[in-house]
Amino acid sequence: MLIYIMKRLLLLPFLLLIFSVIAFILIQAPPGDFLTSYIAELAASGSSMERAQIDALRALYGLDQPMYLQYFKWMGRILTGDLGVSLDWQRPISELIGERMGLTLALGMGTFVFTWLIAIPIGIFSATRKYSFFDYFFTVFNYFGVATPTFMTALVLMWIAFKYYGVSITGLFSAEYIDAPWSWDRVVDLLQHLWLPVVILGLDGTARLARVMRANLLDELKKPYMEMARAKGLSEWRLVMKYPVRLALNPLVSTIGWYLPLIFSGSVIVATVMNLPTIGPMLLRALISQDMFLAGTIILFYMMLAVVGTLISDILLAWLDPRIRLDEE
C-alpha cells in the first residue's frame, strides 16, 4: 500500500508542472489582454487613455514581454508563495482568494456530504427493490436531476420564494450580516442561507451518483458469489452491505478526482445567479476582464484539486479493492 501511494506521489510534481503550462496557455489564448479589455470599457463610457499611459501600464504589468517569460515569472512567484496582484481588483491575489475560501469550503463540503449521503442510499434502495414503485420514482427523479440545469433550478426557486413568500434567497447572509464580524449569530445566519445552495448544487451530482450506484450494484447482485453467500445462510441485508455495496462504490470513488474541482468552483453559473460570495464568480469576472494572474491562479488551483482528488480516489480504491494494490505491486 505504501509503495502504491509513493508511486502516485512521485507523479504529482510532473502533473502540476504540465497543468501550470496548460493553465497559462488557456488564459493567454483569447485575443488581447487586460489592458485591451480595460481600454474597451473606457471607450464604451466615453473616456480614453494616452498611448504613453498604455505603454507604461503594459510595461508595468509585464504584458509587453514574451509569453514564455511571463510564464516563468508567474511560476517563480507562485513557487515562492507570492501569487501576485490582481490587475482588475488591484489587490493581492492571496487576499482575494482567502476572503472567499472559507465560504467556498463550507459550500463545497456541504454539497459533497449532501450528495453522497443522499445518492448512495437511493442507489442501494433502488437496486435492492428493482422495478418497485420506489425504484421507478427514484429513476424519474434521477432523470430530472440530470436533465435539469442547476442554474434553472436556482432561478425557479428564487422566483417562487420571491413571488409567493416575498423573500430573496440570494447570497449567503442577510443584509445586516454581510459586512459584520464573525459571531455566533452570523454563523447561524450563514447556516440558514447555506442549505438551499447546497441542495441546488447537490441535486445534479446526487442524481448522477445514484444512477451509477444502482447500475453497479445490480451488476454485483447477479454475480455467482452472491448465490454462494446466500447458500451459507447470510442475511440478505448483511450480504448486500458487506460485499456488493463495497465493490459498487469503486466507480463512485473514482469520480472524486473530477468532482472535487466542481464542488469548490461552486458551479460558477449558479453562484453568479444566486450572488454567492465564492471563488466561482470571481473566476468569471477575471476571465471577462482578462485578469490573467487571478484567472490563472484560480484555474491552477482547480487543476491541483483535480490532481489531489485523483490521488485520494486512487488511495481509497486501493483500500476498498485489494486487487488494485496487488496489480500495482
Segment roles from a protein language model:
Residues M1-A29, K242:
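Charged, compositionally biased N-terminal leader segments and the immediate start
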Residues L2-I3, M101-F134, T150, Y177-E329:
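Alpha-helical transmembrane segments of integral membrane proteins
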Residues L12, S20, W116, Y143, ...:
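Residue-level recognition of pore/gate-forming positions within transmembrane alpha-helices
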Residues L16, S20, F24-G32, S37, ...:
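Membrane-embedded alpha-helical segments of multi-pass transporters/permeases
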Residues L16-L69, Y165-R186:
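Hydrophobic alpha-helical transmembrane segments of membrane transport/permease proteins
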Residues I22-A29, G76, F141-L172, I200-T206:
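Membrane-water interface segments at the C-terminal ends of transmembrane alpha-helices
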Residues S48-T80, N275-A286:
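Short hydrophobic, aromatic-rich alpha-helical segments embedded in or entering the lipid bilayer
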Residues G62-I120:
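An internal, D/E-rich "acidic patch" concept
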